[in-house]
Amino acid sequence: MIIVTGGAGFIGSNIVKSLNDIGYRDILVVDNLKDGTKFVNLVDLDIADYMDKEDFIASIVAGDDLGDIDAVFHEGACSSTTEWDGKYMMDNNYQYSKDVLHYCLDRNIPFLYASSAATYGGRNDNFIEERQYEQPLNVYGYSKFLFDQYVREILPEAESQICGFRYFNVYGPREGHKGSMASVAFHLNNQINQGENPKLFSGSENFKRDFVYVGDVAAVNLWFWQNGVSGIFNCGTGRAESFQAVADATLAFHKKGGVEYIEFPEKLKGRYQAYTQADLTNLRAAGYDKPFKTVAEGVAEYMAWLNRTV
């Protein structure tokens, strides 16, 4: 059995899909379905069982036998960069992750988890997986950074796989439940389908991010599990592309509309990453040599998926 926490969420459900694609169906999804809309991410997928997150935490803290587990993909977290309830964030992201990690270490279960490029903070170069480059801007980034630090202390003595991935700007299928935290491609598509012009902040040709397609993110997770590699790795394309490029790819699919530029919001000034670009040196050195989709390629595939029934 494989456990995917956050398995009804964006990246988690895409990992479930990728496992299904290689014939794996003995999957336990752990999630919190208080937001019932997330169930749609699972309806076309095959899983063996579902467990509520609180019940799962109680089970692992009690040391319950959950059966023969091949791996845990720990994607369950609060991923909102605008959430400032630090107690909630540390319970949900840091303590929960420690509980799952120790359950896995005690049983030699491979543990692969979601870190984040938010650990780097507002820098605009040297996105390298080393302490000197890490200075998160928000409590979400701090919760991810602190768990990475915890893992770094444990890694040298660990007898089973521990692997963390610093996800950059992930976009693609099954993110609709994320609301305002969904990708810009998702929102631009909605705006066009509602008869509006797609909207970007003024200067969006200068705002560049490492936009990585969720299918590529799932592929990275599966490769590292199958190859037993441990460590903390950036998970992006290694390319910074502009928000304008995302809009251009969206418009190219729809063949209508033009970008409308709006003022940059005051509340985001100083808390907004204007530039991200994953350094893939360590990922490539670990042996992962598959290509990553460009924005033009990934957005085209995503638009086809989003509009398949429209």
Swiss-Prot record:
It catalyses: ADP-D-glycero-beta-D-manno-heptose = ADP-L-glycero-beta-D-manno-heptose. CDD domains: ADP_GME_SDR_e. The active site is at Y140 (proton acceptor), K178 (proton acceptor). Catalyzes the interconversion between ADP-D-glycero-beta-D-manno-heptose and ADP-L-glycero-beta-D-manno-heptose via an epimerization at carbon 6 of the heptose. One of its GO terms (biological process) is ADP-L-glycero-beta-D-manno-heptose biosynthetic process. The lineage of its organism: Bacteria, Pseudomonadati, Pseudomonadota, Gammaproteobacteria, Enterobacterales. SUPFAM superfamilies: NAD(P)-binding Rossmann-fold domains (SSF51735). It is an enzyme of class 5 (isomerase). This is ADP-L-glycero-D-manno-heptose-6-epimerase.
